[in-house]
Amino acid sequence: MNSLTWILAVLFVTPAASYFIHVDANEEQCFFDRLTSGTKMGLMFEVAEGGFLDIDVKITGPDNKEIYKGERESSGKFTFAAHMDGVYTYCFGNKMSTMTPKAVMFTVEITEPHQQAPGAAANQDAADNAKLEEMVRELSSALMSVKHEQEYMEVRERVHRNINENTNSRVVMWAAFEAFVLVGMTVGQIFYLKRFFEVRTMV
């Protein structure tokens, strides 16, 4: 029973955090997480708005060794296992842009290395529990991915709705301006023609 409780608890204890940041033009924002050797860390990101929806991404380890580097990416997902204890850094850079800020939504998921479930007496039971726990972890990761994708879709839907509303308002304003100009030109032509014929009559 203790083993079952331990395994089911894995589904709810996987640390994960979601963030929404704004990276100004020619700026780089970095974040840090302290990991132990063997810990898995997953980074999923998407550029919600700004320019061509691209951002530079970089992940470095405690030894300043580059683990991942991507340039001008609009979205992505990368998972790695910590090769040593220490602070791992992941940065989002917008240095390629001189004017446009970028809005980035990203999620960090940290999975601790496998530990034997308490109360596992025999090796076979321990192996079965480890396999079941790994399956639960994979299910948990899949559910988290679905949740994050839904969050990304909500953000993108909101951004596109704002763009559409802004575009519609501009179209309405431009149509009103064109109508005003058309009415003005029509009235001007009427007065011009009226004056022209009045002059012809006097002659």
UniProtKB/Swiss-Prot annotation:
Record carries keyword Transport: yes
Biological-process GO terms, alphabetical: endoplasmic reticulum to Golgi vesicle-mediated transport; Golgi organization; intracellular protein transport; regulation of Notch signaling pathway; regulation of transport
Positions in the Cytoplasmic compartment: 192-203
Subcellular location: Cytoplasmic vesicle membrane; Cytoplasmic vesicle, COPI-coated vesicle membrane; Golgi apparatus membrane
Signal peptide: 1-18
Result after altering G51S: In allele sel-9(ar176); multivulval phenotype in combination with lin-12(n676n930)
Residues passing through the membrane, by range: 171-191
SUPFAM superfamilies in alphabetical order: Supernatant protein factor (SPF), C-terminal domain
Name of the protein described by the UniProt record: Suppressor/enhancer of lin-12 protein 9
Species annotation: Caenorhabditis elegans
